[in-house]
A protein has these predicted regions:
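Terminal-region recognition feature
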Residues: 1-181
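Hydrophobic alpha-helical segments, chiefly the membrane-spanning helices
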Residues: 182-183, 195-201
Length: 201
């Protein structure tokens, strides 16, 4: 394979201008991501009273200390439906990404119960389906921490069919021999369904 040599001149004014412009966009994304975390953290007093950890605290304890974490679909649902991009920003009411657990690279999903009880949303479902696609392509083990109020019934028409596909994907993972671990951190309306899935462990 021939070597592709870069012709980018990192000391040029145009490069510096592009770098500056892109950094502003990256900073904007990081600010939005922090708003989502802050929105979830507003429920800390409620979680503390119940003796529970916030979703991101659970995730931190699950991951190998100091290990790599790649968040995915961080702005899923941004300004869609009742997401106003500010105080009601939700990230699809879930956290998704790739990280290491006991030295094994895994796809991890976490219900963000700090936001609307972790209720499933249309874009949260899309986020889960994208995660499943990555699992199938890379044969990644799947870990999900579940504390969810179930589906947002006001948006049920937007997610019913694709929500069913997420359950089908769990069965497909089982058939492919992909390790799957679903952990309930609180009783959930999804318990009755997921407990009967062949891939649940």
């Amino acid at each position: 394979m021939p070597v592709i040599e870069s012709k980018i001149m990192i000391n040029s004014e145009s490069f510096k201008k592009n770098q500056e412009d892109h950094q502003k966009l990256i900073d904007e994304i990081r600010t939005l991501e922090q708003k989502i975390a802050d929105n979830s953290a507003r429920s800390k007093a409620k979680f503390d009273k119940r003796g529970q950890l916030l979703p991101r605290e659970r995730l931190k304890r699950l991951l190998d200390p100091g290990s790599f974490w790649l968040p995915l679909s961080t702005l899923a649902g941004y300004k869609i439906g009742d997401d106003d991009g500010d105080k009601n920003i939700g990230w699809g009411n879930s956290i998704s990404g790739i990280g290491y657990v006991a030295g094994v690279r895994c796809m991890i999903g976490v219900s963000d119960a700090g936001i609307k009880g972790g209720s499933a949303s249309a874009m949260g479902t899309e986020k889960a389906l994208r995660g499943a696609q990555i699992i199938f392509e890379n044969k990644l083990p799947f870990i999900q921490l579940i504390e969810s109020a179930g589906a947002n019934l006001l948006r049920q028409t937007d997610m019913f069919i694709k929500g069913g596909r997420s359950f089908a994907n769990l069965s497909k993972m089982s058939a492919m021999g992909i390790p799957t671990c679903l952990l309930y951190t609180s009783p959930s309306p999804r318990d009755a369904t997921l407990s009967r899935m062949p891939s649940s462990a």
